[in-house]
Regions:
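A signal for specific C-terminal beta-sheet/loop modules enriched in small/flexible residues
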Residues: 45-69, 125-143
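N-terminal domain-onset segments
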Residues: 1-64
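Short loop/turn segments at secondary-structure transitions that flank enzyme active sites
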Residues: 40-42, 79, 111-112
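Short HxH-centered metal-ligating active-site micro-motif
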Residues: 56-96
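Glycine-rich, aromatic-bearing surface loops/beta-hairpins
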Residues: 94-170
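Short glycine-rich, low-complexity/disordered patches
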Residues: 28-38, 70-77, 169-170
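Short, surface-exposed beta-edge/turn micro-motifs
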Residues: 30-34, 68-70, 92, 99-104
Length: 170
């Protein structure tokens, strides 16, 4: 059964794919980008960085995704098949003889994480993963979601404190 996070990630990836259809370098983007889903249903790019991990770890990124129920990171790279044991092996995907160029959207909301992979050699096909991904990118997305939740909670606590202080000053 498809989760709500998967549905949102698929919709987000389709919107981002539509935006990138006419890009000359749609499979070799110079920067990873952070996108948010607005209340109007639009995907809006809020930040970019040449290094996807630095983008995900930046405090500015936390602030840029606060207040939005869904955010997604877009990046490009190489994918390679996993072995029969489900392992990637020691060879980096970029060096694998069966490597494929991909554009990856990893989205997150309060219910989970989902990713959508689009392959350059078959751009009309996608592979959707409902939070089963593992590795440093998946860990970084989960970390960003946690930091976002903590920052939003801190903002709410500050607002409550200000309201309570306002009541005692009256």
């Amino acid at each position: 059964m498809i989760t709500s996070t998967e549905k949102t990630a698929i919709m987000a990836e389709n919107k981002i794919d539509y935006i990138h259809k006419d890009f000359k370098e749609a499979w070799d983007l110079p920067s990873a980008s952070m996108w948010v889903l607005t209340n109007k249903g639009d995907m809006v790019c809020v930040s970019k960085h040449p290094d996807v991990y630095e983008l995900l770890e930046a405090e500015d990124t936390v602030r840029s995704v606060m207040g939005f129920e869904f955010f997604a990171v877009l990046t490009c790279g190489w994918a390679a098949p996993i072995d029969d044991l489900g392992e990637l092996g020691d060879l980096p995907p970029s060096k694998h003889k069966k490597r494929r160029r991909v554009r990856l959207v990893v989205g997150s909301d309060y219910d989970g994480v989902a990713s959508v992979i689009r392959f350059q050699d078959k751009p009309d096909e996608t592979v959707v993963d409902a939070g089963m991904a593992r590795g440093s990118l998946a860990d970084s997305i989960v970390s960003l979601q946690k930091r976002k939740a903590l920052a939003e909670t801190a903002d709410v606590m500050t607002e409550i404190k200000q309201l309570l202080e306002g009541e005692t000053n009256e």
